[in-house]
Amino acid sequence: MIELVPSLRKFAYSLTGNLHDADDLLQTTIERLLSKPLPDQVTLMAWAFRVCRNCWIDEYRAKKVRVHANDTLSYEANSASCHADMDEVITQAVTLKQVSSAMDDLPCEQRETLSLVAVQGMSYAEASDVLQVPKGTIMSRLARARAKISNLLNSQNEVLS
């Protein structure tokens, strides 16, 4: 069997195309040859090459399954990520609708002030110029508007829970 090793190694390399994989295949082949008796009416060389080829086919199939399993796991992870992203979009849409509904329940002055500062991004000074009220009034309207929206959203969440 020792004299077959160089030929088996070349054959394994021709199957795998890689020296490291060829050496692994050669080792598996030799282990299998040593663990099973030689069948009757078969030459050692023919048997050794057949075992090497069968080991390569087994490894090829196993790699294919591993690659498919990795692709499936990757797809499931991406799918889960996609579902998580979709859940996030839905949650944001529901939250936006709740906030919009809560803003509609605010008194006109508070809704205008909150819209200018929180939605439009104006500073307190800019909002006070637009609404022609003191800066302190803007701050107090914002505080009351935020408190009312917070209470409305908390009560809606309690109903949903």
Predicted regions and their residues:
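A short pre-motif secondary-structure segment
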Residues: T113-V117
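Helix-turn-helix DNA-binding motif, specifically the short coil turn and the N-cap/start of the second
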Residues: N18, S123, Q132-T137
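C-terminal edge and immediately downstream basic/flexible tail or linker adjoining helix-turn-helix-like DNA-binding
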Residues: H68, A125, D129-Q132, R146-S161
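Acidic, proline/glycine-rich intrinsically disordered inter-domain spacer in sigma factors
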Residues: E76-D104
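Arg/Lys-rich amphipathic alpha helix in sigma70-family domain 2
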Residues: V51-D71, Q92
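Short, small-hydrophobic-rich alpha-helical interface motif
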Residues: L8, A12, A22-L33, A127, ...
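Sigma70-family region 2
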Residues: Q27-L44, A62-K63
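A short, charge-rich alpha-helical start-of-domain segment used by transcription regulators
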Residues: M1-K10, S14, H20-D23, P39, ...
